[in-house]
Amino acid sequence: MNLDSRIDRIIAEELGRHTHAHKHTPHCNWCWTCPECKSEFVSHVVNHGACRVGAAPGIGQLHDGLAQYIDHTLLKPEGTRAQIETLCKEAAEYHFASVCVNPTWVAFCAHLLRGTGVLVCTVVGFPLGATTTEAKVFEARQVVEQGACEVDMVVNIGRLKSGEYDFVAHDIAEIVKASHPAHVKVIIENCYLTDEEKIKASLLCREAGAHFVKTSTGFGPSGAKIEDVALMRRVVGEHLGVKAAGGIREFQTAEKMIEAGATRLGASASIAIVEHKKVA
């Protein structure tokens, strides 16, 4: 089945979900929430040779494990060296998954975080995604050489909305290749997309070898939405991580995003989230 056919099939399935109540179907394993899905997935991995099955912390235990979901983020253009240094100290203290910073700070963060277990994440083609593939490839190679372990690239939104799926898939695949061994998260910027385009973009990320699909840059008119996270999770299944970013500022929102299928959260209010505090 070619890419266009797979896209059409998944769109039909997902749009059908909006007109029918959720029930167990042959494709229900994409939801990752109902008991049938979880049971079938565990049986599947055991039957294929797994001798142990691990699970992320349940929602009830998030107060202990939530920090491991969070990319502690400072992407504002006015961020100073002192603020970046504070970001790294906080990430090491709270054991966040990573710091997410602009490329100019990657080497500095890699030096500060050496030996802490906190990864350095950065952005490519940010925040518009409209630079050439060649420019993104150059950026990706450079930041990985400087110590980035994760690269959050922005999809070419205009090409996606123009239906140029081969171009978009190639763009993603080239950054995945250039970033190796770092993992790539593809920001599809949901605020500009229809549901059909979100499905197409998520599938293209999977086909192109990305490691995560991500909701938002945080610089668009809106950020992560629970329904988008759930949709992206259903489309990519267990194959990719899902990162929710933009507007996540309190524990309750973070909890709902994870419950919907997010395996990573991008946030600048990370400490307030893990300490259950309100941010003005």
Spans of model-derived segments:
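Short hydrophobic "strand-cap" motifs at the C-terminus of beta-strands
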Residues: 245
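Protein-protein interaction and targeting regions used for scaffolding, dimerization, and localization
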Residues: 1-39
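Extended, intrinsically disordered, low-complexity segments
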Residues: 28-56, 269, 279-280
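Exposed alpha-helical structural elements
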Residues: 2, 6, 10, 41, ...
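Generic surface-pattern signal
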Residues: 12-16, 20, 47, 58, ...
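Alpha/beta enzyme core
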Residues: 55-94, 104-242, 250-275, 280
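N-terminal carbohydrate-binding/catalytic regions of secreted carbohydrate-active enzymes
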Residues: 97-100
